[in-house]
């Protein structure tokens, strides 16, 4: 492996770019050189036969196109990872994991938040397993993951049932055109904007259930607190079944143009 002279904790820029003979990388074995904390831009780009890598639990940073167009089909995201940078490829801004054949991602126990743009443009991604510890899906995490159709929490979690996620930020699932159903339980906020719709472009989405959260003060008064943001599900014409429960606010045009709201109104009273 190649390391930076100063810290010896970085797999350097383009270190193994287009090394087509590379098949497996075990970062844990590199600790004699220092804790591998950074995989730099294009470090493994074009390693089309790289099918196995162990992302060390010391890893904190993955930079642009680090694993672009590799043979990886499955990875586990360590809880130590705190930074991912996107980069431009083929005229689009994509995550370091795009351009290849990555089909399954598992987030390790202890991960509390996905990172912005983490798998953006990874069009091969089909399945994501989240830990119960994960509370926030950040902006554009799975944007344009057009093959994503299965989400679960834990090994025994129900398919497309997210019951521990509290916040979903703008664009998180925008362009996930293979996702057909989604159940959100105990969600406090679905952030969204008309220019970056959280579930925009989910053209196969047929059924959505959202159960909000309530808070109870010391007098016993219960208050609704969940908000569904502007244009969150707008123009998903296949979406014909929407179940909402204990929702405080459905923002402007949240469901406009969906199959159940062709007149342009928001189905805020649907339960």
Feature annotation, model-predicted:
Residues 90-91, 257-259:
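Short, well-ordered amphipathic alpha-helices
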Residues 12-17, 40-43, 63-66, 95-97, ...:
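Consensus positions within tandem repeat domains that build extended binding/scaffold surfaces
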Residues 1-10, 20-38, 48-61, 70-83, ...:
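Structural signature of tandem-repeat unit edges
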Residues 91-95, 219-221:
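Short, flexible coil/linker elements and helix-boundary hinge sites characteristic
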Residues 89-92, 119-120, 160-161, 199:
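A structural signal for leucine-rich repeat
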């Amino acid at each position: 492996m190649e390391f930076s002279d100063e810290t010896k904790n970085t797999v350097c820029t383009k270190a193994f770019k287009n090394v087509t003979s590379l098949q497996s990388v075990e970062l844990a074995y590199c600790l004699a050189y220092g804790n591998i904390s950074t995989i730099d831009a294009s470090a493994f780009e074009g390693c089309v036969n790289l099918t196995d890598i162990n992302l060390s639990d010391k890893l904190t940073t993955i930079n642009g196109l680090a694993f672009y167009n590799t043979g990886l089909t499955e990875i586990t995201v360590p809880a130590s990872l705190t930074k991912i940078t996107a980069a431009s490829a083929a005229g689009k801004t994509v995550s370091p994991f795009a351009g290849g054949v990555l089909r399954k991602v598992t987030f390790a126990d202890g991960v509390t938040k996905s990172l912005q743009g983490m798998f953006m443009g990874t069009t091969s991604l089909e399945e994501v397993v989240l830990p119960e510890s994960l509370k926030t899906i950040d902006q554009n995490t799975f944007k344009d993951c057009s093959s994503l159709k299965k989400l679960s929490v834990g090994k025994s979690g129900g398919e497309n049932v997210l019951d521990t996620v509290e916040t979903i930020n703008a664009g998180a699932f925008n362009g996930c055109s293979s996702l057909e159903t989604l159940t959100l339980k105990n969600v406090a906020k679905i952030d969204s904007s008309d220019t970056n719709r959280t579930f925009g472009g989910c053209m196969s989405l047929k059924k959505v259930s959202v159960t909000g959260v309530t808070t109870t003060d010391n007098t016993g008064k219960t208050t609704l607190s969940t908000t569904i943001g502007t244009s969150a599900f707008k123009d998903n014409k296949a979406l014909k079944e929407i179940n909402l429960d204990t929702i405080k606010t459905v923002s402007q045009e949240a469901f406009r143009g969906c199959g159940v709201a062709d007149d342009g109104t928001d189905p805020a009273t649907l339960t």
